[in-house]
UniProtKB/Swiss-Prot annotation:
Pathway connected to this protein: Carbohydrate biosynthesis; gluconeogenesis; Carbohydrate degradation; glycolysis; D-glyceraldehyde 3-phosphate and glycerone phosphate from D-glucose: step 2/4
Gene behind the chain: pgi
Full protein name: Glucose-6-phosphate isomerase
Keyword annotations from UniProtKB, A to Z: Cytoplasm, Gluconeogenesis, Glycolysis, Isomerase
Similarity comment text for this entry: Belongs to the GPI family.
CDD domains recorded: SIS_PGI_1, SIS_PGI_2
Amino acid sequence: MSRLTDLPAWQALEDHYYELQGTHLRELFAADPERGEKMNAEGAGLYLDYSKHRVTDETLRLLRELAQATGVEARRDAMFRGEKINVTEGRAVLHTALRAPRDAVIEVDGKNVVPEVHEVLDRMATFADAVRSGEWLGYTGKPIKNIVNIGIGGSDLGPVMAYEALKHYAQRDLTVRFVSNVDGTDLTEKTRDLDPEVTLFIVSSKTFTTQETMTNARSARKWLLGSLKDDAAVTRHFVAVSTNAEEVQKFGIDTANMFGFWDWVGGRYSMDSAIGLSLMVAVGPEHFREMLAGFHDMDEHFRTAPAEQNLPMLMGLLGVWYGDFFGAESLAVLPYDQYLASFPAYLQQLDMESNGKHVTLGGEPVDYQTGPIVWGQAGTNGQHAFYQLIHQGTKLIPCDFIGFCQTLNPLPPHHDLLMANVFAQTEALAFGKTLEQVLADGVAPEVAPHRVFEGNRPTSTILADRLTPRTLGALIALYEHKVFVQGAVWDINSFDQWGVELGKVLAKKIDGELQSEGEPELQHDSSTNALIRRYRARRQG
């Protein structure tokens, strides 16, 4: 047994699970009719109803004891202090500094990093205002109308999600697009109807050597110069988010138009940094800063709220409860707002890249479940796709429902109907429909078993008044810190991502073999060798 599963707090939860596993949510609500009024918490403008979870007060107490025993709060405080809790890379983890107010003091190696953060934010704001106002002109003297962000992973998923989420607040005479996939189709389709004279590319790569990003960037430069015919045009149509001034300059970008960030910011936590430049251009510096304020609101809530009312702590511990004791393998995130359609995809990287780990901080194999598979879709579309399996399938899938009390686009009766579905789905998942109830409805006995809903499917419901930049910031930070809580309990490093490296190394080797003019000497396994040979033989059509 590992250190974690050896803990009395863990073993107490195991015993408690065996006592509680057969208890239905119907029973829990019957035993306490006011359960829904009690099992909720609020912070940073978000309201969390966790009453439809398969927990009792005793469950929650035992989960908090596990958090105490695994040092979650101590590790949280170490993160906020700037200690190097990313032990495999020897780095501090300070995405929280990206949204700290100007007068905050957050030190890394004895240096307050906050002034530098705000210096970059101020430079970003000056640039964004220049583009938005038409002051920034392209090579031929025309104002910019199209923004294309080129990045991948954390340099893409966050800005894409946030741009879509805040589109209501965007400057509509600017077209904003995102290119990430090294598949040439992505860049081709995103630029097909754009005019190079009024298009600006933001190339986001810390090292400016990321293979996919730089392949796209070079092709974008070729596309631009195919029309403008002068290398000098690059300086008016490309800016960089990077820390590698030498490579940026080599590409043809003026380093005065390079926006940097720091090694204490992980890629999937970087959208508050210069990585969010495309978003700031789209929605404006004021709305971007409002979003940062929302992040900071949740940071402070996570840092100061007691465990029993702490939203990230509650959500993180509930995830541990289902993953490690009930054996749930996935989490469905279901935002009932079309603006949040990309939120589940963003959370996939945030959660799965952070907590998809199989060894502890000390390098020992774990003997328990770590991060879940995260997936989902905007409601109500998902109801007509995969909810069938959640309701009547054989897998236990905890769900997070996200909704807003006010819509940004009043179109009666749409919003009431949308939110009616949120509340109906969580009720149906919790309480289901028994065979007796189905038969009482007059359903034929031979059909009745097919109409039974077992229920007892756990859900969280997160409500906010309105989707604003500030609300979005708080919502993202809630999930960031939820992931942190789980990583701390599991004693894993949530801030490295070595799992992406091996494939990258092999791809570089295979790319050389694919481009070889002569027949390469292949030394892979027989399957990979056969696939390479077939591709080489057939790629010309």
